[in-house]
């Protein structure tokens, strides 16, 4: 599949193109909850406002979004039906969980990534000194929406905001009667709230990865070639890594994998394809992504916290032409291990350096591998 310049421009969603909806949820009138920015970058996410701008509606198997808030602002307690991954881009946040936010809390700092379990009430506040910015990955093309804590729902209704059965907000002017009960999403019954699993801080933070914990390794066949010293560090699920000792922080299935990639100055990956749709969320450093081959080649330079949609089957290459390392997150659809497909010349060059893939698709010394068995 070829990517044209026009298509690449459409798929490279720059941070300056993200469009905030400042009243995406029913908690926007609660004290300490406004102003608050919600961004739907790839897919609608869980917005409850029909006017939310969505940069790219194409299904990827997951949604990419973001939230921005000033110091002291809170995103109130709610639960998801699929995974919610927080990527702390800028600022410092305090996570809280439980129906009243009293079951535990943890600090989320710049560069941290945490995978929040489904069916757990969670919220977060900007407890730093500057504007905070989080990016999110939500499992599934249809996330199913969210359930608000009953306490949040009651307080939101007192401000005139109700939630209809279509998961959209109903704004009732002061002094007007409440909407008919059969048109509203009901509050979660107390017995169901009590039945939810409780998570202690140690359990939750076992699902987080801090910058110092990133296990960067030479992890793909091409990375043994001169000038191709890029590295991977798994976060969630099983991604591109072909290193047999790599283990993600979160191994239970979420429907997607998340890995940090690091490209040192002057290094690159070889061009490769994947059978799955992917998204690159760029953190920092001079990173270009090139597509196609020969005269059809097109490329784009990523900016900080830009998002790039990479369709399945496209030939892509990560290149650092600068003087400092580049870091980005690669999110790929599916729970199974991914199999990056390199040109035969990459395999031949790696073999000359005594490196190959074993029968389990892991890196191994070619000199240790027996001849292929006839089938």
Could you tell me what each predicted segment is?
Residues 1-60, 163-254, 361-375:
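A short, N-terminal "cap"/entry segment at the start of jelly-roll beta-barrel domains
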Residues 99-117, 293-312:
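Short acidic-glycine-tyrosine-enriched beta hairpin
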């Amino acid at each position: 599949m070829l990517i044209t310049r026009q298509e690449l421009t459409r798929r490279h969603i720059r941070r300056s193109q993200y469009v905030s909806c400042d009243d995406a949820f029913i908690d926007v009138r609660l004290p300490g909850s406004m102003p608050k920015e919600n961004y739907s970058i790839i897919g609608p996410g869980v917005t409850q406002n029909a006017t939310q701008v969505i940069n790219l509606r194409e299904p990827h198997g997951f949604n990419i979004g973001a939230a921005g808030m000033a110091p002291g602002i809170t995103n109130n307690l709610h639960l998801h039906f699929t995974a919610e991954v927080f990527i702390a881009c800028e600022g410092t946040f305090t996570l809280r969980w439980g129906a009243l936010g009293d079951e535990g809390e943890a600090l989320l700092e710049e560069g941290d990534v945490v995978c929040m379990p489904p069916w757990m009430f969670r919220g977060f506040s900007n407890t730093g000194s500057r504007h905070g910015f989080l990016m999110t990955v939500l499992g599934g093309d249809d996330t199913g929406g969210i359930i608000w804590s009953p306490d949040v729902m009651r307080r939101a209704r007192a401000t005139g905001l109700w939630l209809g059965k279509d998961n959209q907000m109903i704004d009732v002017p002061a002094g007007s009667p409440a909407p008919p009960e059969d048109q509203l999403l009901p509050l979660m019954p107390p017995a169901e709230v009590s039945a939810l699993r409780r998570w202690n801080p140690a359990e939750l933070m076992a699902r987080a990865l801090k910058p110092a914990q990133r296990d960067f390794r030479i992890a793909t066949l091409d990375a043994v070639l001169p000038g191709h010293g890029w590295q991977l560090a798994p976060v969630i699920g099983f991604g591109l890594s072909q290193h047999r000792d790599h283990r993600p922080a979160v191994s239970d299935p979420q429907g997607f994998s998340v890995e940090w990639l690091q490209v040192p100055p002057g290094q690159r990956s070889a061009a490769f394809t994947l059978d799955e749709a992917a998204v690159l969320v760029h953190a920092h450093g001079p990173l270009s992504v090139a597509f196609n081959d020969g005269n059809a080649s097109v490329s784009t330079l990523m900016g900080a916290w830009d998002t790039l949609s990479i369709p399945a089957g496209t030939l892509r290459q990560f290149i650092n032409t600068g003087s400092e390392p580049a870091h980005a997150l690669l999110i790929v659809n599916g729970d199974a291990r991914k199999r990056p497909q390199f040109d035969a010349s990459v395999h031949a060059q790696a073999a000359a350096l005594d490196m190959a893939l074993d029968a389990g698709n892991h890196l191994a010394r070619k000199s240790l591998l027996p001849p292929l068995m006839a089938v």
